C-alpha cells in the first residue's frame, strides 16, 4: 500500500532501511525542505532526482510532499 503522508512514508523507509522511525522521519523532513526549494525553482526534474537520490523512491511519491 502506498503511504498517504510523511509519517507513513517515514515508517516505510524505517522498515526498509532498518533504521528508527525518528531517523527516517528526520530524513523525510530534510527532503521536504529540499523539495520546497525545487518547487520554488519550478524544477520537477530536480524534485524527482531528490526523491531518488535521498530516499531511494520513485517520483510517484511526490504527491505526499505537495
What does each model-identified segment do?
Residues 10-16, 31, 35, 48-51:
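Leucine-/aliphatic-rich long alpha-helical segments
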Residues 35-66:
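Long, compositionally biased
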Residues 23-35, 65-66:
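Short linear loop/turn motifs
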Amino acid at each position: 500500500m502506498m503511504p498517504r503522508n510523511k509519517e507513513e512514508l517515514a515508517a516505510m523507509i524505517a522498515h526498509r532501511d532498518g533504521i528508527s522511525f525518528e531517523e527516517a522521519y528526520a530524513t523525510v523532513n530534510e527532503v521536504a525542505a529540499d523539495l520546497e526549494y525545487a518547487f520554488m525553482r519550478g524544477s520537477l526534474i530536480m524534485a524527482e532526482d531528490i526523491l531518488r537520490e535521498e530516499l531511494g523512491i520513485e517520483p510517484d511519491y511526490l504527491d505526499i510532499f505537495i
